Amino acid sequence: VFNHKHMEAKERFKVVYSAGAKEFLQRITSKAREKIISNARKASYTIDPKLFKKLTGTDLWEFRTLYDGKQYRLLAFWDKTKEVDTLVIASHGFIKKTDKTPIKEIERASKIMKEYFELK
């Protein structure tokens, strides 16, 4: 017999939303926002590249949500300087029109990451 009660899920990392990510979440519909936050929470417990994956050739990761036919993305980076050495900072969000993540979004997230670590 398979017992679910003993399958305690362990959070693998904490998600912290930057001001830019929070602004993005405020601008979209509440249903889309709930779905994105729910997926980010889910990603912190599971390994699912449909929800959270590394952007090739960068130090950035993206939280991925498909909702109501739209591809929502929150770009993120790791901060391993804290005790929870797997803290993820979601830098900002955008809605993707194509399969590729736009270079300008990657550059923006890289700039936010650089500023974040300079302020530490």
Label the predicted regions.
Residues 1-71, 80-88, 95-120:
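Basic, Lys/Arg-enriched alpha-helical interface segments
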